[in-house]
């Protein structure tokens, strides 16, 4: 499962993360994955791939998945990539708390993502927030 914006989850535990850094028209992509052992994370449950697959088998799987998604991103409407992300994300309606970079905390229900990847958060009173940066708690 994917947790916005960049966490990779396995059975509700953080397995890894995806980082993107843009410079001009180029983007560097980094993947961090707990292959052999789950680290101790304060306030967060972590997972590793060791019980799911052999660590040496992971690189070809990652390379193939990344190549497919990169092709989708380059050759199609960005909304198709957003839809592909949603099929692997926490379900619409999941209760979330977002801690923004401005030390603001907002809570509501996951309402999808925008075409540019921003999080849609529906507050309890019905208003919709579009979140472009922050840390999400499930």
Where are these predicted regions, by residue range?
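Alpha/beta catalytic cores of group-transfer enzymes, especially the acyltransferase/condensing modules
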Residues: 2-6
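Long, positively charged amphipathic alpha-helical accessory segments at protein N-termini or as interdomain linkers
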Residues: 10-138
């Amino acid at each position: 499962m994917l947790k916005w914006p960049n966490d990779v989850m396995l059975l509700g535990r953080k397995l890894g993360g995806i980082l993107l850094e843009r410079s001009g028209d180029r983007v560097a992509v980094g993947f961090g994955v707990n292959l052999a052992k789950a680290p101790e994370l304060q306030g967060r449950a972590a997972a590793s791939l060791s019980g799911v697959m052999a660590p040496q088998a992971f690189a070809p799987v990652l390379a193939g998945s990344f190549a497919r998604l990169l092709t989708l991103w380059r050759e199609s409407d960005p909304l198709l990539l957003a839809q592909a992300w949603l099929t692997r994300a926490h379900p619409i309606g999941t209760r979330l708390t977002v801690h923004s970079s401005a030390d603001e905390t907002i809570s509501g229900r996951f309402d999808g993502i925008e075409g540019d990847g921003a999080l849609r958060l529906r507050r309890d009173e019905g208003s919709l927030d579009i979140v472009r940066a922050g840390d999400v708690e499930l």
